[in-house]
Curated annotation (Swiss-Prot):
Belongs to the GHMP kinase family. Homoserine kinase subfamily. GO terms for biological process: threonine biosynthetic process. It is found in: Cytoplasm. This is Homoserine kinase. Its EC number is 2.7.1.39. Its main location: cytoplasm.
Length: 306
C-alpha cells in the first residue's frame, strides 16, 4: 500500500498549537505492508530518515497505536520524504499521518479522523519531544483546522470562503532538532495585554476565513508572543512581511516554528514583486531561499493498494 500526506503550516499568526493549514507544496509518502506475526514488530526504512522505531515519527506513531490496541503483527514501512525537514512545513507530522492512515486501512482498525489525529500526534514525540496536534490535524483533515482540545483530541475543520494561495519563502538549510529548540524559546509567562491582543488576532483570522473577508484575515495574521520569542530563528521575517503587505499581500506569518515564512496572496497581490523583493531581503540576511507557491490541499489518502 502507498499512502500520501501533504505538507502544512501551523499557527497562522496567533493560533499557536491551535490552527494549521494543509497545502500542496510538498507531500510525504509511506509504502507499507502488514504480515501476520506472533508479536508486534515495526520495521522502518527510507533515505535520510531514522530507522530506529522510537526516533521516527511514522514508525513510532504506528508502534504506539498497535501496542495500545494489543495488535500482534509485523509492519514493514518505507518512508519517502518529499517535505523538507526542520523548516516549519509539518514534515514529521505528515509522515506520521501517512503511516497511521495506512495501518488503519491495512488492518481495518476503523479509526475516525479524531482518532487518526490522536494516534498521529504521538509520532511527534519522536521528532520534537512533544505530542503537538496542529500539523497532524491539518494533514489528516486537509484544509484549515482548529484544535479545540487535546484530552480528548477534538479537531474542527474551519470553512474557508476566501480564495487565496501561499507564497512560501523556504530557507535552503538543514536544522537539527529545530522544533524542540523552538519550543524551548517560548516564554513561561505572558503579559495579560499581549494575551488579549493575540486573542483578538486569532478571532480575526478565523472570522476572516469563514466570512471571506481579506481585511479581517490581514488583521489576524499577527502574533505578539510566539513569533516574537522565536524571532532569532527568522531575522528576515519582519522586513519580508512588510514588503509583502506593501505589495498588497493579504498578510504573512511564520510557518509553524519557522524559518519558512508563509505569505498569503490573492488576485489583488503583486506576486512577482513580492517574490523578487522577498528574495532580495533573504539575501541581505545571507539566507538563500526558494519560493514555492501552494494552494490549500486535502487530507491524507491511499494512493495505491498492492
Amino acid at each position: 500500500m502507498l499512502i500520501k500526506a501533504y505538507s502544512s503550516s501551523a499557527n497562522l499568526g496567533a493560533g499557536f498549537d491551535i490552527l494549521a493549514l494543509a497545502h500542496n507544496a510538498f507531500e510525504d509518502s509511506v509504502e507499507m505492508e502488514a504480515i501476520p506475526n506472533s508479536t508486534l514488530q515495526v520495521l522502518v526504512t527510507g533515505d535520510g530518515v531514522p530507522n530506529e522505531v522510537d526516533k521516527n515519527s511514522a514508525s513510532y506513531a504506528v508502534y504506539r497505536l498497535l501496542s495500545e490496541l494489543d495488535v500482534k503483527v509485523k509492519v514493514k514501512m518505507k518512508v519517502i520524504k518529499g517535505i523538507p525537514a526542520g523548516l516549519g512545513l509539518g514534515s514529521s507530522g505528515a509522515s506520521a499521518v501517512a503511516a497511521v492512515v495506512g495501518v488503519n486501512n491495512l488492518l481495518k482498525l476503523g479509526l475516525d479522523k479524531q482518532e487518526l489525529v490522536r494516534a498521529s500526534m504521538i509520532g511527534e514525540i519522536a521528532s520534537s519531544g512533544s505530542a503537538h496536534p496542529d500539523n497532524v490535524a491539518a494533514s489528516v483533515y486537509g484544509g484549515v483546522v482548529a484544535v479545540l482540545n487535546t484530552e480528548p483530541v477534538t479537531v474542527s475543520p474551519i470553512p474557508v470562503n476566501l480564495n487565496f494561495s501561499l507564497l512560501l519563502f523556504i530557507p535552503v538549510l538543514q536544522l537539527k532538532d529545530k522544533t524542540k529548540k523552538a519550543r524551548e524559546m517560548l516564554p513561561r509567562n505572558v503579559e495579560l495585554g499581549k494575551m488579549v491582543r493575540n486573542s483578538r488576532y486569532l478571532s480575526s483570522t478565523i472570522l476572516g476565513l469563514v466570512k471571506g473577508d481579506r481585511e479581517l484575515l490581514r488583521l489576524g495574521l499577527n502574533d505578539e508572543i510566539v513569533e516574537v520569542a522565536r524571532s532569532p530563528l527568522f531575522p528576515h521575517y519582519e522586513k519580508l512581511k512588510k514588503i509583502s503587505i506593501e505589495n498588497n499581500a493579504i498578510g504573512a506569518c511564520v510557518s509553524g516554528a519557522g524559518p519558512t515564512i508563509a505569505v498569503f496572496v490573492d488576485e489583488y497581490s503583486d506576486k512577482n514583486k513580492i517574490k523578487k523583493e522577498g528574495l532580495e531581503i533573504c539575501e541581505t540576511y545571507s539566507q538563500k531561499c526558494l519560493v514555492k507557491e501552494a494552494k490549500i490541499a486535502g487530507g491524507a489518502w491511499v494512493e495505491r493498494w498492492n
